[in-house]
């Protein structure tokens, strides 16, 4: 099995002009002698068993001579599954996937090497299974994870192709600014795109808030210990801020953290489909990584950092990005000094993309605030306020916002 159908290979026959390929007794293809492999893209019905055979032929003076047909070989096409969510929290690692209705079970493979050398394998039996707990993963090591489904036909087991892998990335205390983070016991996860044209760029998607206990811990607003130059969730002049706050509550009672997570999961899938790799720093209700921790992860494992939020107003004013304040002392502070123009450019592109996708934009699409995120960012980084407490956050609305974010990234 591969993504497009069933791949067939055979031994080369010396002197042959070419080969005929048969599926279920019917000739489907004629290939030339240089080829000893072929992918039957027509053998792509999920859960269907196909039979294949090969016949060599030789053409001499316009006349074709055929060999006897090879013994038949059977193979079942099984559509591949993909990893949906992978989390590693306080020693517990869980993986979930989108189930295949024709699969009888799944294999999950995980290894410290991307080649999956010396990999561990967990077999999950059951047609309706779509998650598994992985064991014996060390907290200080990175792990690559992939999966495939299987189906039984008689006494034989057939497998789908392997999914694109995801990588668990543990916290590294040697990273720049790592010492400023107070909460970082969970791991981030890097998802690799399986698009036909990958962009070789990684976007960190940060679903704002969602860290239990974060409000009881304080961190420095700036890495140099200076005071905030504007107000915001933390007052102007403050030296320390909440490591990560709980967020607001939308007018229908939905916690902001839940709304941003719903959006983040949609953005993740759309970016992967568009060819971007995606770093996720929160994929569930509680991710034990604070604002500085999420920023440090993005700095070291991504090319761009987009944090998703809803503003605390109730006027349905529209979306905007948080720009860098026009304060010279702040702009001169490292790492802001090297990146503030990149932050603002990313924000403008994202607002442009959302506006072109049909998202309501607030004013000129920018509000300047001194944020912890941009104060520690060494890559293009932006807080994107996608609406406020009165904004529509239905699945349809979130898909529109996500499409706009992809448009902005592609600009």
Where are the language model's segments positioned?
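Pro/Thr/Ser/Gly-rich low-complexity, intrinsically disordered linker/stalk tracts
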Residues: 1-15, 46, 62-102, 139, ...
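Short, surface-exposed beta-strand/beta-hairpin micro-motifs centered on an aromatic residue
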Residues: 7, 35-39, 94, 129-133
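Conserved hydrophobic/aromatic "anchor" residues
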Residues: 10, 19, 50-52, 57, ...
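Extracellular low-complexity, O-glycosylation-prone stalks/linkers
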Residues: 13-28, 102-123
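Short coil/turn motifs at secondary-structure junctions
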Residues: 15, 26, 59, 102, ...
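Short beta-strand segments within Ig-like beta-sandwich modules, predominantly Fibronectin type-III
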Residues: 28-35, 122-128
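Beta-strand-rich modules
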Residues: 38-65, 134-157
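Catalytic-site microenvironment of enzymes
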Residues: 90, 169-411
């Amino acid at each position: 099995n591969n993504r497009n159908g069933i791949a067939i290979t055979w031994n080369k026959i010396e002197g042959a002009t070419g080969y005929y390929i048969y599926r279920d007794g019917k000739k489907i293809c004629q290939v030339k002698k240089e080829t000893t492999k072929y992918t039957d893209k027509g053998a792509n019905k999920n859960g269907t068993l196909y039979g294949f055979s090969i016949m060599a032929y030789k053409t001499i003076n316009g006349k074709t001579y055929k060999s006897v047909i090879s013994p038949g070989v059977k193979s079942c096409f099984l559509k591949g599954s993909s990893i949906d969510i992978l989390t590693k929290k306080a020693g517990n690692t869980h993986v979930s996937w989108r189930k295949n209705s024709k699969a009888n079970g799944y294999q999950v493979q995980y290894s410290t090497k991307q080649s999956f050398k010396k990999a561990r394998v967990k077999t999950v039996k059951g047609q309706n299974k779509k998650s598994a707990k992985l064991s014996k993963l060390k907290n200080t090591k990175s792990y690559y994870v992939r999966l495939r489904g299987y189906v039984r036909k008689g006494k034989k087991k057939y497998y789908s192709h392997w999914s694109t892998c995801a990588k668990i990335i543990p916290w590294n205390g040697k990273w720049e600014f790592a010492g400023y983070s107070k909460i970082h016991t969970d791991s981030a996860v890097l998802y690799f795109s399986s698009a036909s044209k990958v962009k070789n760029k990684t976007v960190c998607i940060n679903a704002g808030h969602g860290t239990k206990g974060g409000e009881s811990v304080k961190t420095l607003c700036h890495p140099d210990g200076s005071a905030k130059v504007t107000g915001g969730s933390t007052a102007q002049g403050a030296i320390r801020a909440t490591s990560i706050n709980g967020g607001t509550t939308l007018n229908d009672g939905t916690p902001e953290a839940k709304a941003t997570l719903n959006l983040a999961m949609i953005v993740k899938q759309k970016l992967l489909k568009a060819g971007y790799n995606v770093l996720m720093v929160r994929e569930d209700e509680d991710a034990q990584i604070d604002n500085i921790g999420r920023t440090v992860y993005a700095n070291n494992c991504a090319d761009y950092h987009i944090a998703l939020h809803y503003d605390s107003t109730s006027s349905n004013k529209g979306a905007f990005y948080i720009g860098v304040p026009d304060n010279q002392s702040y702009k001169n502070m490292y790492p802001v000094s090297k990146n503030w123009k990149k932050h603002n450019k990313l924000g403008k592109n994202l607002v442009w993309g959302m506006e072109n996708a049909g998202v309501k934009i607030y004013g000129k699409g920018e509000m300047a605030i001194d944020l912890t995120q941009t104060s520690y960012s060494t890559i293009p980084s932006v807080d994107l306020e996608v609406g406020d407490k009165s904004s529509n956050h239905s699945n349809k609305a979130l898909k529109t916002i996500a499409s706009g974010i992809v448009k902005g990234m592609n600009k």
